[in-house]
Design a protein with these regions (language model features):
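A short amphipathic helical element positioned immediately N-terminal to and/or at the very start
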Residues: 5-14
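Membrane-interface anchoring determinants
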Residues: 11-12, 20, 40, 47, ...
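Short, strongly hydrophobic transmembrane alpha-helices
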Residues: 16-43
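Membrane-proximal extracellular/periplasmic loop immediately following the first transmembrane helix
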Residues: 37-103
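Short acidic/polar micro-motifs at solvent-exposed secondary-structure junctions
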Residues: 62-73, 96-122, 128, 132-145, ...
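Mid-to-C-terminal secondary-structure elements
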Residues: 120-132, 147-205
């Protein structure tokens, strides 16, 4: 019985090639669009969901107009952090963060290039940074650095890196204060290391 159904369906496909092609292409296109929409929804729902209070964490953007067009960007003046705290007391925590860039990290003869951010002290709570080892408040001192577990292994192998010194760009000595996991793929904040925002203010006044 089932075999006959397939035979009849095949004959109809051959007999009405144009209509069959239109139907098949339409079905394929519909399924592809549905999959794309599903992936987009999944991305929207899961992005930063590992933050403890992800539904209360927002990024401040700046609008600028050029030649009649409006643009949004992440670049903000340094004082904005303190201004937000002063003028909006409902903001429980505020953490400045730069765009991120690659720096050379050097330990002895080892030299690797990794991507990271200067970031504010309150980022630990805001972004639910899980401290695997080291200081629970690792951004208190400006000349410090937090490494992901992967970066720590790349620099120190099996040694405990906490308390050790990493030289950044062959010029700045930073003490490793904590180790954190590498952020998940669903995180909008990507990094191999994190450095206190206070150091950024010192070297980029």
């Amino acid at each position: 019985m089932v075999k006959n159904f397939f035979k009849i369906a095949w004959r109809n496909l051959i007999k009405n090639k144009v209509y069959s092609l239109i139907n098949i292409v339409g079905l394929a296109a519909g399924m592809a669009v549905a999959m794309i929409i599903g992936l987009w929804i999944y991305d929207e729902v899961t992005t930063n969901s590992h933050f403890k209070n992800y539904d209360s964490v927002y990024q401040v953007m700046m609008h600028q107009s050029f030649d009649g067009k409006r643009y949004s960007q992440q670049a903000l003046p340094y004082p904005i952090g303190e201004e937000l705290k002063a003028k909006y007391p409902d903001f429980k925590k505020v953490a400045m963060c730069d765009w991120g860039q690659k720096h050379s990290l050097i330990v002895g003869e080892k030299k690797i290039s990794k991507f990271g951010h200067f970031i504010g002290e309150q980022a630990v709570d805001m972004f639910t940074l899980k401290i695997l080892d080291g200081d629970k408040n690792p951004f208190r001192e400006p000349y410090s650095i937090v490494l992901t577990d992967e970066t720590a292994v790349a620099l120190f192998a099996s040694e405990n890196p906490v308390g050790k010194i990493v030289k950044m760009d062959n010029s700045t000595d930073l003490k490793v204060t904590a180790i954190v996991p590498k952020p998940p793929k669903t995180s909008s904040l990507k990094y191999d290391y994190l450095i206190p925002w206070t150091l950024n203010e010192k070297i980029n006044p």
